From Swiss-Prot:
It is an enzyme of class 3 (hydrolase). Bidirectionally degrades single-stranded DNA into large acid-insoluble oligonucleotides, which are then degraded further into small acid-soluble oligonucleotides. The keyword Nuclease applies. One of its GO terms (molecular function) is nucleic acid binding. This is Exodeoxyribonuclease 7 large subunit. It comes from Cyanothece sp. (strain PCC 7425 / ATCC 29141). GO terms for biological process: DNA catabolic process. The keyword Methyltransferase does not apply. Its main location: cytoplasm. InterPro entries: Exonuc_VII_L, Exonuc_VII_lsu_C, OB-fold_nuc-bd_dom. Keywords: Cytoplasm, Exonuclease, Hydrolase, Nuclease. Belongs to the XseA family. NCBIfam families: xseA (TIGR00237).
Length: 424
């Protein structure tokens, strides 16, 4: 009994092992996707030879492995050296080895995965921007000593915004504070921060800019290491204070800013002087001026008395001639010295008087501000304790006005006394 297989089960040609391997090699090595491919995984083993580094890359959660090789001539070009147990990202191409019927990844570059990759990118960008001179101390600009308008770039919902407002109003009443709102976390934060800085530039009123946010995880601060944000700070026409709430590492925004501190409150303290401290300093200088004048006058009186005693001890005629010359010389010298000292003290006193006048709370009232008091004289600082019908007294620059509360509006429905939100 015979059995005949249908002809269709036997193709006209049958591939040899070499032919099949060559076919697979052609498919893999000529595939454009595999000529330059990025692969990530964990290094499970590594062996160093004269010809190069041989290691295995695998997925930690799966039983899948890929043999890899870095030729000796390429080792020095790697950003990191693959070490067993570490997560890496590899760049290379697929090569087939017919003798063993295997394929391998021929590696050109190795990068750290996860946080290691972020750190590598940070170092590379920092080095490039430093080479351009963006972090050069010579680029740093001094802060204005007495700014009248300050812009703040931060999130309106962030605690940093409240901290900055409270600090500025306490240290420098009457200061104009402009908020240019921005996202300070997430993928959209870099573009949002750049747009907020550009709005401040276009508005043109601010004399200094505070870029701030509260503390957070390292990944939350990534937007402050973005190249567009760094260049926007560098190109800003007014001094920039970076008040980013972190202690461990400096962001690139810190390095390029004119001044940087670690908290929003510290940034606000740095932006404006304390008026109370300025007044104390003025009083001290005035006391010093008065003391110096009194000391100079007492010295002149002592010199005059000394010359008078010498005059009495000389013969009359000779005494008159000598003392006349001495008195004339002393008089001329005294007049010149006192005149110079007096002119210097008067000029200094005028400067101090002008500064004191500019810091006088009454000058703030003359610019259109008012102080609201209850009937018992208590100053109102918030609407939270007000009720409709309450009687108030408004202190203006030239008198007082008795008013009654008819309607209470929250900050979003009216104008704030010391801060306003930019809608540009």
């Amino acid at each position: 009994m015979s059995f005949t297989q249908p002809n269709l089960l036997f193709p006209p040609t049958v591939l040899s092992v070499g032919g099949l391997t060559q076919y697979i090699q052609t498919l893999l090595e000529q595939d454009e996707e595999l000529m330059q491919v990025w692969v990530t995984g964990e290094v499970s083993s590594a062996s160093q030879h004269r010809s190069g580094l041989f290691f295995t890359l695998q997925d930690p959660d799966e039983r899948v492995a890929l043999r890899c090789i870095v030729w000796a001539s390429q080792l020095e070009k790697l950003s990191i050296l693959p070490v067993p147990g570490e997560q890496v990202i590899l760049l290379g191409r697929i090569r087939v080895y017919p003798q063993r019927g295997e394929y391998q990844l021929m590696v050109w570059q190795a990068l750290p995965a996860g946080e290691g990759l972020m750190a590598l990118r940070y170092r590379q960008l920092r080095d490039r921007l430093e080479t351009e001179g963006l972090f050069d101390p010579a680029r740093k600009r001094p802060l204005p000593p007495h700014p009248q308008t300050i812009a703040v770039v931060t999130s309106p919902q962030a605690a940093a915004w409240g901290d900055i407002q409270r600090t500025l109003s306490h240290r420098y009443p009457g200061l104009r504070v402009l908020l240019s709102p921005a996202l300070v976390q997430g993928d959209q934060a870099p573009d949002s921060i750049v747009a907020a800085i550009e709005r401040v530039e276009k508005d043109g009123r601010a004399e200094v800019l505070i870029l701030s946010r509260g503390g957070g995880a390292t990944e939350d601060m990534a937007c402050f290491n973005h190249e567009r944000v760094v260049r926007a700070i560098a190109e800003c026409s007014i001094p920039v204070i970076a008040g980013i709430g972190h202690q461990r590492d400096e962001s690139l925004a810190d390095l390029v800013a004119d001044v940087h501190v670690h908290t929003p409150t510290a940034a606000a303290q740095l932006a404006v002087p304390d008026l109370a401290e300025l007044y104390t300093e003025h009083c001290q200088r005035l006391d010093h001026l008065i003391t110096a004048g009194q000391t100079r006058l007492a010295l002149a009186q002592n010199q005059l008395q000394h010359q008078n005693r010498r005059l009495k001890r000389l013969p009359l005629e000779r005494q008159l001639v000598q003392e006349g010359r001495a008195i004339a010389h002393l008089k001329q010298q005294l007049i010149q010295t006192v005149s110079q000292q007096l002119q210097q003290r008067l000029t200094h006193q005028q400067l101090l008087a002008q500064k004191l006048q500019s810091l006088d709370p009454r000058a703030i009232l003359q610019r259109g501000y008012a102080i609201a008091r209850r009937q018992n004289g208590q100053i109102l600082r918030t609407i939270a304790a007000l009720q409709e019908g309450d009687d108030l007294t408004l202190q203006l620059s030239d008198g007082q006005v008795k008013v009654q509360v008819r309607k209470i509006m929250a900050a979003g429905t009216g104008h704030e006394a010391e801060s306003e939100q930019m809608e540009l």
